[in-house]
Each structure stands twice: as structure tokens, then as C-alpha cells.
Amino acid sequence: MTMEKSVILKRGKEESLQRFHPWIFSGAIQRIDGKPEEGDVVTVYTNDNRFIARGHIQVGSIAVRVLTFKDEPIDQEFWNRRLATAYDMRERTGISSREDNNTYRLVHGEGDNLPGLIIDIYGETAVIQAHSVGMHVSRMQIAEAVKKILKETIKNIYYKSETTLPYKADINKDNGYIMGGNASNISTEYGLKFHIDWLRGQKTGFFVDQRENRSLLEKYAKGRKLLNMFCYTGGFSIYALRGGAEIVHSVDSSSKAIDLTNANVEINFPGDTRHTAYAEDAFDFLDRMGNNYNLIILDPPAFAKHRDSLRNALIGYRRLNAKAIEKIQPGGILFTFSCSQVVSKENFRTAVFTAAAMAKRNVRILHQLTQPADHPVNIYHPEGEYLKGLVLYVE
């Protein structure tokens, strides 16, 4: 008889699971039975042999990512049910059913009770990204569930996990199409068109999580002179142009990002002379710019991906925000963000507070921003709340 692949917890270490937290850390494990390989589904038992969860096992600090707290098989029907539940939430909240929007996140990891899995929808293409070996091993079942749930609306499924999986010599994690391949890379977000580069772009090709914040920015753009730092695809710039900005300057250190921004401007506002893009380091640009702008967006990449880099990240946020607050015109509005999971809302707000004091400007908070509804936060997994932003009025 084959021994069940299972994890036995140390005494008392089931408490976080009883509160439905989806991670089991390696230090909580008494022993592992059945010789599971990385990415296998294991059954988790308390020290007195009570069933408590089932999930993917992986070498590392997070040893098991919980898929279910029910004693149920992890089979094709499981994946079908979970993706159907995720899609139903997007339908009921109006995210996936809008005629002017076919760009959204279908699965957001722990927020959809599928830790280690991201699925973004770009028109007729679904991009699957695994952040755990278990989700990599399950990718074909996940793709089958996508096909079943989205039916005729999805013609292409692209798998993009080369940069998100831990190094393992014995797994093939090459990016590529699971289904289709002759895909248009133009997607629509709230009536605006964007070139999505899921083959070579960051993340799955687009920062879907800023959709509602871009829409808010549009309401402030009319007649303003706008600077979009770390522009990447130019999302904020495109919304600002539609909102009636007088001028829009987009800055990114990557020339590829500038090319993509210019292409997105051209597809929405061909020949619009209000927009100029600069391939330049953000700090260098801020140092040399005059007091030319009254609406600035700071949306940098994650300054800290690990807790040991938190201190340097907070220094970076202070320096960046202080320079922007110093340079923005009186009556200016600053949209400033952090997407670092290890930077808490309190950390970020304190960094911006310190920046305002350094710049010696009177500053008021107009909005406190976060991720949109298609990036839900599991109430039992507060670590999932990673995006934080402030909209500031600078006198």
C-alpha cells in the first residue's frame, strides 16, 4: 500500500490554520511522510493526527501553501470550481462584464484561495503565472479550467513563469503558449487601448492593479501639466490625456518602456503633441527638472522585495517623494505609490510624511488608495494587501 504524502505539524502549530491562514512555515512541521516531491499535493495533519488542510509542498520558508481546508481531492473538478468562483466574483462586481473593459485579473493568489497562482485576462488571451512549484506542476489542469470557465471568450492561453519560479534544475519552466498563439496583443481598459507585451514585459505584461487609480487620476487631469515617473506602459499618461491634461511628460529608465508608452499614446491619441516621453533615470530627471508640473505620479517598482532591504527602501521613498513635493507647483497634486509587500501602509505613510517635512511644504491627504476588487485580499491573509497609495494636495 502506498503511503499517503502528508505533513505532520508540531504540537500547537495548527493554530494559524484554524484561523485559515494559507501558509505553513517549515518550522511548524514535525515530520513529512510518503516522500512527496516538490509541487506535490500533501495532506496536513495536527500532531494528534486530525486532518486540517491540503496543499502544495515546496522547499523553503513557506513549506506548504494551503489549497483547501476541506477533506476533498485536488482534481480537475477542484480547479474548475475554484476558477468558477473567482470568475463569478468578477462578474458580480462588474469587473469582467463591462463592455468597455476586457482587461482584468481572474485569479489573485491567496485572495482567491489559490496561493501561488496569478491569471490575468487581456481580451482573448489568458496569461497564467505560477509563483510556486505546485502551481507549475498543475498548470495544465489550470489551463483546462480556464478553457471551461471562459469558453469561447478565450482563444489563447500563455504560460509565463520563468522569472517567478524558484530555480529548480529538474523542472522545465519555459514560457510559451498552452493554447493558441496567433494573438492580438491589444487589450481594452475602460475604453482605452493598450499594447500588452506578455512575451517580454514585466509581470504578465501590464500593471492591471492600477486600473481604478488611473481612472481617478483622469478626473484630476484637466488643464494640468503632468509628469508620470516610472511610466512603463504609460497607463497613467493615457488616462491623463483623455482627461484633458495640458501637457503630459512620461519618464522611464527603460527605452523599451518608452517605446511602449509612445505606441500606446499613438493608438489612442494619434499625433497628439501634448505628450513627450523621456528615457532617463527618475532621480536624475527630478534633480534637473524645474517647477514645471502641477500633477505628478510616482509609481516606482518595488524598492524592497525582502524584509532585509526595508530600511534602504524607506530611504528611497523618502528621497523620491521629498524631491517631488519640493518641485511640484503650489496647488499641485501628487499621486504616490508603493507596491512593496514588505512596506506596510504605516511605513509608507511615515516615509511620505517625512518627505513632506524635508521639503518644508504644507501637504494634505486627499485619498488613500489600494488595489482594485479583482486583486482581493483574503481577510485571513493580510499580507496580500501590497499596493498602497496616497493622493496629496501640496500648497
Where are these regions (language model features)?
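Non-catalytic accessory regions of SAM-dependent methyltransferases
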Residues: 1-121
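Non-catalytic substrate-recognition/targeting regions of SAM-dependent transferases
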Residues: 107-120, 136-207, 215
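Conserved class I S-adenosyl-L-methionine
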Residues: 223-232
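Conserved SAM-binding loop of SAM-dependent methyltransferases across substrates and taxa
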Residues: 233-246
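Conserved SAM-binding motif I beta-strand of class I
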Residues: 247-252
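S-adenosyl-L-methionine
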Residues: 256-297
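Mobile active-site "lid"/loop adjacent to the S-adenosyl-L-methionine
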Residues: 293-323
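C-terminal catalytic and target-recognition region of SAM-dependent MTase-like enzymes
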Residues: 333-395
